[in-house]
From Swiss-Prot:
Gene: Cyp2j5
BP-aspect Gene Ontology terms: angiotensin-mediated vasoconstriction involved in regulation of systemic arterial blood pressure; positive regulation of estrogen secretion; regulation of systemic arterial blood pressure by hormone; renal tubular secretion
Membrane topology: Peripheral membrane protein
Lineage: Eukaryota, Metazoa, Chordata, Craniata, Vertebrata
Protein name: Cytochrome P450 2J5
Reactions catalysed, as given in the entry: an organic molecule + reduced [NADPH--hemoprotein reductase] + O2 = an alcohol + oxidized [NADPH--hemoprotein reductase] + H2O + H(+)
CDD domains assigned to the protein according to its UniProt record, in alphabetical order: CYP2J (cd20662)
Amino acid sequence: MIMFLSSLVTTFWEALHLKTLVLAVVTFLFLINILRSRHPKNYPPGPWRLPFVGNFFQIDTKQTHLVLQQFVKKYGNVFSLELGQSPVVVVSGLPLIKEMFTHLDQNFVNRFMTPVRERITGKNGLVVSNGQTWKEQRRLALMALRNFGLGKKSLEERIQEETHHLVEAIREEGGQPFNPHLKLINAVSNIICSVTFGERFDYEDCQFQELLQLLDETMHLMGSSAGQLYNGFPCIMKYLPGPHQKIFRNWGKLKLFVSHIVKKHEKDWNPDEPRDFIDAFLIEMQKDPDRTTSFNEENLISTTLDLFLGGTETTSSTLRWALLYMSSYPEIQENVQAEIDRVIGHKRQVSLSDRESMPYTNAVIHEVQRMGNIVPLNSSREVTVDTKFNGFHLPKGTMILTNLTALHRDPKEWATPEVFNPEHFLENGQFKKRESFLPFSMGKRACLGEQLAKSELFIFFSALMQKFTFKPPINEKLSLKFRMGLILSPASYRICAIPRV
């Protein structure tokens, strides 16, 4: 009996100690969370936060930009969030965005390194690198774009040649309903492939088609709930199964694809006659055998992939939006075709020199970019030093999101912000630039492929309007619904391309 009571007391004390220990651990974690969540005086306002998860579950990742629009209405043009353990400040409005990226550009020049990007690229490449690495990679990328086509007749000729392949591929559909996604992404991808890899890929190349599908899936997953969960809670998510693990498997396949092309280049390249970006990078590596710069194997793969991704997804998604809007607004499509018929005719190839004579077509392309809104929150930045901004204190290391959705749908800037209206970019029949139009961002980290993208959009779009009339399938209604990922792309759709000539 005494032994039984002794055992019972011992068990009781052990249970009590265990509960005390658990309570102590939980209390400690809450205190740590409170200390980490404490903000300095004059920190931007924002919605209430849950311990540990912050505002993560208050944001619908399928329409993040629309949720943030509601926060803008409540908290103003500068407000704060916490995504997992990451403090975030969202900035809206043209004056504040200009101040951030021009007058205070040194304080916001760095990219914020998300856990997903850190795992797949480290601090390598062009998109998320900072400091000396970014400067060196950007310099070489700009040189490659300049030397291998940007602003030269050869690039225009490459786009025109690829346009011919695209037109023929669409013509083969015979006016029947089809999804233009893969054809457009293949055409656009071939332009940047000619600059980076020195070759194009046929539309029937099964291996390349599979790669493009991997690319599309990866971009979608990185911006999905699974990708954002990983960014918010990497220490936990890296051990759990789920769609987020596919990001890393897919990225490995993309790296392997580029690695094979690099190895082929290493076998037959001539330093005196560089053919493309990879050759130019190999020359820089040869100059620096001790690897004192960022020109190494890791950056070769990462920067090449960054150029490939950046030069493919954004422009192809814009063209997908363009065909969707033209199919949905036939009267606007007719106006574009009338201008093309008057300036170019039915047979002559579209040229960049035609752009000045085609203000309406140019306005339509810009309106597609405004309404398509493919980069609704810009690429994230990081505060490099403690900064006073618009009366608020922004601590070093804070993630910054610039709200391009609010800018491109601002009723103070646009007559009909929620309606597709090319007149936004026209004045007295002439094309009008708009200061509040920033699809390529601004400042030192603006998109370095802006001129390439503009050239592609004009030639591809004008040529497709010249050769086809795009319509919804019979008895089908097109939807302008979007799919959220790293970029905002249209939901899958089918259209009919009716030959005009």
